[in-house]
Amino acid sequence: MPLSVRLRRLGYRIAFRLLQALWFVRRPRKSGVKCLITSGGRILLVRHTYGARAWDLPGGAMRRGEPPLQAARREMQEELGLGAAAWRAAGELRGSDNFRHDVIHCFRAELVEPTVRPDPVELAMTQWFAPGALPSDLAHYVRPVLDQALPATGGI
C-alpha cells in the first residue's frame, strides 16, 4: 500500500477520534445515510479504515442542506465509485452512536454487475455476503437497516 494512502488513513483515524471528543461534549444531532446494495442475492458490506472497523453498510454523513437521496448518491460515488443506480428509499432509523443523536436515511439499490471501486483511504475492505452468512462483527446499525429495508422492498 502506498505511503500516501497509509498517511491519509491515519489522518481519518485521528480526525474520527477528535470528532468523538467533540461529540462527547456537544451531543449533536446528525443526519446520515446507509445504503443496502445488493447483487445476485448478496449484500455488500464494508470495513472502514477508522472507527470500530466492524462490517458496515456503506454510507456517511449528510452535508448541511443536502437531500438524503443526493447524500446517498454522493457517498456511494466517493466510497465505492458507483455512479448511476436506481435508488429506492427504504425507511429511516433514529438512534445514538458515538455520543451523537442520529437520523439515518436508508436506501437500497440492486446492481446488475457487482463491480465496485472502493476508496482505499476510507475503506479497508469490501465483500459480498449471502443474507444467511453475514459476519458476526456487524456495526450496530446493520441489522436494523436490513430489517427496515428488506420488508419495504420485497426481500433480496
Predicted regions and their residues:
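A short coil-to-beta-strand element that immediately follows conserved catalytic motifs
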Residues: 83-92
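Active-site-adjacent beta-strand/loop module that shapes the phosphate/pyrophosphate-binding cleft
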Residues: 93-117, 127, 142-145, 149-150
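Conserved hydrophobic "DFG−1" position in protein kinase catalytic cores
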Residues: 37, 45, 108-109, 128
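Acidic, metal-coordinating catalytic segment for phosphate/diphosphate chemistry
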Residues: 1-34
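Conserved Nudix-box catalytic region and its N-terminal flanking loop in Nudix hydrolases
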Residues: 33, 38-78
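Residue-level preference for beta-strand/loop junctions
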Residues: 29, 53, 85, 101-103
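Nudix hydrolase/Nudix homology domain
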Residues: 53, 120-156
